[in-house]
Amino acid sequence: MKRTGSASSVPRFQRSMSYDQSNSPTAGAHAKANTASPAAEPAPSSKEKENWNRQEENDLEEDDRDDFGTAAISKVAGKPGETDDEANEKLRTKYLLESFDEEQMQRYEVFRRANLNKTNVKKLANQILNQSVTPNVAIVISGFSKVFVGEIVELARKIQDQWGDTGPLSPDHLREAYRLSRQNRRLYPQSRHVSHLFR
């Protein structure tokens, strides 16, 4: 028997031959030979393999995302899911930024771009804690420090307005802001080590 055509057409031809010979006395031998040979089952093409892999990945993702029906209940009940909360937060931020005037937008952009040097923060934390600090902890410390500096500067600007001063902030404004923040330090944890930020 000559094999002509592509590899995918060969198994079909062999199957049709086995069905045609089913009435002959040697049909059992041919059928056994066809089923035992590896050519009887067509090898899956690369596209079929990709489709199977995609289907398996989709099934696994569906299993991972299985919320036991709570997502459908929350949609029916009208409760927004986590993605809705994120979308609402982005929408609120967008509206807030649109309501800023030019000066507020400039200050916001400066605050977003301003960063504390993470290597210096890490060195300072290592020195104070007497142990090595991981990079993630240094990032957290620098983030909190940035917020603290922002609050001090904001309070110093209010003090500058109260005093009737103009121009850039002076060290006097920053000292007074730090003093007032220490008076209202109920939210900040107290430390045993007393250090003077402004001398």
From Swiss-Prot:
Q: Does the keyword Secreted apply?
A: no
Gene Ontology cellular-component terms listed: chromatin; cytosol; nucleus; transcription factor TFIID complex
Here the segments flagged for biased composition (Basic and acidic residues) are 46-57
Q: Relate the protein's function as given in its record.
A: Functions as a component of the DNA-binding general transcription factor complex TFIID. Binding of TFIID to a promoter (with or without TATA element) is the initial step in pre-initiation complex (PIC) formation. TFIID plays a key role in the regulation of gene expression by RNA polymerase II through different activities such as transcription activator interaction, core promoter recognition and selectivity, TFIIA and TFIIB interaction, chromatin modification (histone acetylation by TAF1), facilitation of DNA opening and initiation of transcription.
According to its UniProt entry, this protein's organism is Schizosaccharomyces pombe (strain 972 / ATCC 24843) (Fission yeast)
Q: Where is the composition biased (Low complexity)?
A: 31-45
Among PANTHER family, the record links this protein to:
TRANSCRIPTION INITIATION FACTOR TFIID SUBUNIT 11 (PTHR13218:SF8), TRANSCRIPTION INITIATION FACTOR TFIID SUBUNIT 11-RELATED (PTHR13218)
Pfam families linked: TAFII28
**Listed GO MF terms:** protein heterodimerization activity; RNA polymerase II general transcription initiation factor activity
Keywords, ordered alphabetically: Cytoplasm, Nucleus, Transcription, Transcription regulation
Q: What is this protein called?
A: Transcription initiation factor TFIID subunit 11
Query: GO annotations under biological process?
Result: RNA polymerase II preinitiation complex assembly; transcription initiation at RNA polymerase II promoter
